Amino acid sequence: MSTTDMKDVVREKYAQAALRAGTTKGCGCGCDPKLSDPVTRNLYDAAQIGALPEKAVLASLGCGNPTALAELKPGETVLDLGSGGGIDVLLSARRVGPTGKAYGLDMTDEMLALARENQQKAGVANVEFLKGEIEAIPLPDNSVDVIISNCVINLSGDKDKVFREAFRVLKPGGRFAVSDIVTRGDIPADIRKNLLLWAGCLAGALEDKDYTAKLAAAGFTDIGIEVTRVHKAEEAREWFKEIGVDFDKVAKQIDGKTVSAFIRATKPRGCC
């Protein structure tokens, strides 16, 4: 399974999600409501999403609420890795205010088009959506105060490069504050090789200790992982069936081993 193959599958799945945003009740990791509901429900309160365009909410593909985690302040510059339909970028733009800036980075043309449509409908000026990959962030060194991401880093085939790039663009003292899927315990190799499971935020998820080690190797300090939800295999029974995976065969191997988590880290002050 090559990195290119993984990227193509992910791009296609999330392009489909963008196109469906106006006609479905939502789509989470894996772009299938049967899988997404247990992962994505109750992430945002009504006050947060009430003023957002409906399509921004419907296209939400996350597993957490990094805008709440990040403790954004007025005047800060924030970057959302894998910004999708733009929900977290628009929420971040509110928090940093007119003196701040919120960037969204996505590799999928359909998602970028949807995000820019949502930005226009929301009437938010301090937002910019960039096309690119999270392994090669198109921003200069030391230019961002906070990096957020919502259930996207697990989709990358080169997470070490993602963390190095995040470290590079953060200012000294900058904060890494993401929601992601993390595993606890071994996931069988045949599951990790399944491209559709990768696009569904399962096969590519790092084990918690590996996530911590990779962040540290990139230079981050003050690393913490807080589990917010444990996912049971039964929640995804129908989705496994649809993609042709024998649920009864894999259920015991994955049950309770994937969790939604908040991951925090800091780029040291006085650093590069």
At which residue positions do the language-model features occur?
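Short, glycine-/aromatic-enriched active-site segment of Class I SAM-dependent methyltransferases
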Residues: 182-202
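Class I SAM-dependent methyltransferase SAM/SAH-binding core
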Residues: 58, 63-65, 73-136, 161
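A short His-aromatic
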Residues: 154-155
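C-terminal lobe and adjacent flexible extensions of AdoMet/dcAdoMet transferase-like proteins
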Residues: 15-20, 27-31, 214-272
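Class I S-adenosylmethionine-dependent transferase superfamily signal
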Residues: 92, 151, 166-167, 215
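Hydrophobic beta-strand segment of the Class I
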Residues: 78, 147-148
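N-terminal auxiliary segments of SAM/dcSAM-dependent transferases
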Residues: 1-42
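A short glycine-rich, Lys/Arg-flanked "PGG" loop and its adjoining helix->strand segment in the class I
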Residues: 97, 160-175
